[in-house]
């Protein structure tokens, strides 16, 4: 009861208007379970009885009546099926099972599916060519009114037992309205949840496109304000990636995807760190501050989508647990197994898809320094030298390696260092760094001037393709 109240209150207070109508209707599903339990009880199938009937035959091989429960699919709708298997030979000595069979047989909710015959006499070579009897029991159909019920249990068994050496196992399907209603309603509501999420994904993807375009204009190195906005947004995105708000990149976090509660705390930490970094202009009307407010709003919207999905997934788990508790039909694992292959139901990809879009569109606008660092000095790899193994190092560090006669690449151990000359300088990458990392390059030059390891003039290699650094 407590979860139902919390679920309803969270939908009303924490979610946008209209989202509650698209969510799982937990209270209505509980009422449906109550009606289903009443239908089962009218057939003598209490939760305790069902638990006994569903016990494996290895527990009680002499069981006269067994029950099996399965779930199938018709389109996106989950369809339940209850099958009662009756062994008439064992039914003679089981008064409880015989009484239950009489109650089921008198009901108009069951249909005979099939009748199988098992011989109690060991087969002989001459018997192998004989065919089993072809006559079967009359079908008990919900639409048929001509079925005669017997006066006593003994008459039922005697008239339907074929012979003393043959035992018949009859399978009957129980069709209950509330059982079908429950799963039809549940899967229909799951589609409503997915429909709302699909709509929200489109809205968020569109917002990402618009925001990325606006940031690319204001943070462009060619803008009138030069590099102020560029470094402002580089710092914002650096803090954002370190925050791991929705998806953790750390191997220690096995789940990787954050819970909405944890994501909310990380989002607040991110906002606090941006304010502490003082990378935003003080004026609230400044374009960078306006775009940052939009960026925060985008993340808060993504957080609501993730919360909505988790709440509904928890509601489904809770309602299926209650279904099993009231009926003992163990439908929960069957249900999740059936909908596992359905791309529309309970898919955990909303946050991942939107975070990927953030990374591929927003973060690609402003290159991060960590992607252009030299692996040796951990500074910008200006005047980048690309070795034959494709690894890139700054010219300053490569000169030191060659001076020390180190031929192995520090990353892959390939013998490429001593082969490097002026042809290995990546001029396109160098121009790119000049455009996006002017401050870092200036600091790099100042550090190199103070480095005692750097002589006034060093030749990278001797010969025709030498590269002289002054």
Swiss-Prot record:
Biased composition of type Low complexity is found at 122-136
Per its UniProt record, what InterPro entries does this chain match?
SPX_dom, Znf_C3HC4_RING-type, Znf_RING, Znf_RING/FYVE/PHD, Znf_RING_CS
Zinc finger residue ranges, RING-type: 374-413
Q: What biological-process terms (Gene Ontology) are attached?
A: positive regulation of protein catabolic process in the vacuole; regulation of phosphate transmembrane transport
Can you say what this protein is called? Uncharacterized RING finger protein C6B12.07c
Q: Where are the transmembrane segments?
A: none
Compartment annotation: Cytoplasm
Its domain of life reads: Eukaryota
| Record organism | Schizosaccharomyces pombe (strain 972 / ATCC 24843)
Q: Which GO terms of the molecular function aspect are on file?
A: ubiquitin protein ligase activity; zinc ion binding
Tell me which UniProt keywords the record has, alphabetically.
Cytoplasm, Metal-binding, Zinc, Zinc-finger
Query: Which PANTHER family does this chain map to?
Result: RING FINGER PROTEIN 127, TRANSCRIPTIONAL REGULATOR OF YEAST FORM ADHERENCE 3
List, alphabetically, the CDD domains matched: RING-HC_TRY3-like
